[in-house]
Structures are given as structure tokens and as C-alpha cells.
């Protein structure tokens, strides 16, 4: 009787275990899979705080040069200037341009520049649902990983437009949200390399930057090309260097 009772208990335990594994635990297993997938997706990035940043990190006087909308026709020239002056920078690329110019992205990564996520095709994120915003961010990062085997740990919303949803999406992906504190408005040149635009870009960078200890400078290397930005960049670098700034990435 004792052995039969023990056998019955053991059989019941097996049945219950099978039932739990096959049915009751499915949500838990799915949740665990989701956690593992998120961990894999965010591997390599430090934890990100909630909120948006506009000032360069680091002690003392620091400046961060950032380039949006690339890679584009002026990217190669910008890389040459940065290399010549041995200056770090951050590129907030767009997914469609990453797919179109993968070799330039690989050059950016190989040279040690930071990669930022500027969405897949630069929409106004405030007009999109949370799911659509997530797809814009994730699709860009997936393309970046496929092309250069890296993940962007920084995110910049197109046009600087964002709501709380974007901040949460970025934080869950261990991506810091970066805006800017110095706007060169170089995009207004629209492909022109005239001295007027070069001087204007330099003037805005110097006027806005000189009053800040930690400026984040916004420039572009859009597909149409920005020759005025390329011409202004050496002057901007020399200006900040002469005023005691240390160049950093975001």
C-alpha cells in the first residue's frame, strides 16, 4: 500500500509538471523570451536615463560636434576634416541613407566615431503611434547592425520633435536622447557652397557656442551634400580648440 501510494503521488506530480510547462507557464516563458530579446538588442549600451540632453558630457569645457541626416555626399569630406584635426564626432544617421551608402557608415565606425539613430526615414515622430515610432527607431538600428555590426546608443528625434513616448522608447532600448544647444542652420544652404553660407554657419556656431561650457553643435551631411558645412568645419574646430574646449562624443 505504501509503494502504491508513493507511485500515485509521483504520477500526479509528473502530470501537474507537464500541465504547468505546457499551459500555465506559457505567458511566463514568453515574457522571459521578451526580456532576453531586449537584452540582446541593447547589449553594448549603458543604461540610459529618462529625458533629453542638450549639453556635451565631461568635465571642464567640452564640445560635441554632431552631424544629422547622413550618410550623404558630403560625408566623406567631413570625415577627412575630422581626421585631419583628430576630432571625435557623432553621426545621427537615417536608415534609408545607411542602406544606400553602407561603405560610408563602415568608414565612420572604423574611424571610431559614435553612431546615433535618427530614425529610418526622418518622419515627424509626434504624428506617429507608439508602435510606428518604435518601428522607425528599431528599423534604423537593425540596418546599422547589419551594415556595420554596431548599435546606436544615442537617439535624436527628427526636427527635435518628441513627446514622452519617444523618451520611454529610447530609455527601454538603452538609448540616450540627444538634442543640441548650438544650431548652425547649415541645412538652409541647401547644397550651396557660397561664402555667404559658409560665413553664416561659422558665425552662428561661434556666437551660440562661446557662451556655453558644454555646447552640442548641430550640423548636417544630408544626401544632397553640404559643401558649405565642409568649408566651415575647420574654422569651427579651430575656434573651439583656441577657446580651450575639449571635443567629445555623445
Please identify what each model-predicted range represents:
Residues 1-65, 80-90, 213-250:
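Terminal accessory/targeting
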Residues 123-150, 161-213, 228-231:
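Alpha-helical scaffold elements lining the catalytic groove of polysaccharide deacetylases
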Residues 36-128, 132-152:
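Active-site beta->alpha N-cap acidic-glycine motif
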Residues 81-85, 104-107, 111, 143-147, ...:
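Alpha-helical structural signal in soluble globular domains
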Residues 88, 114, 176, 183, ...:
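Residue-level detector of anion-binding/catalytic polar loops
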Residues 28, 103, 158-159, 235:
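Hydrophobic residues in alpha-helical membrane-spanning segments
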Residues 67-70, 92-96, 119-120, 156-160, ...:
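Active-site-proximal beta-strand/loop segments in catalytic clefts of secreted hydrolases
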Residues 68, 82, 91, 115-118, ...:
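Divalent metal-coordination and catalytic microenvironments
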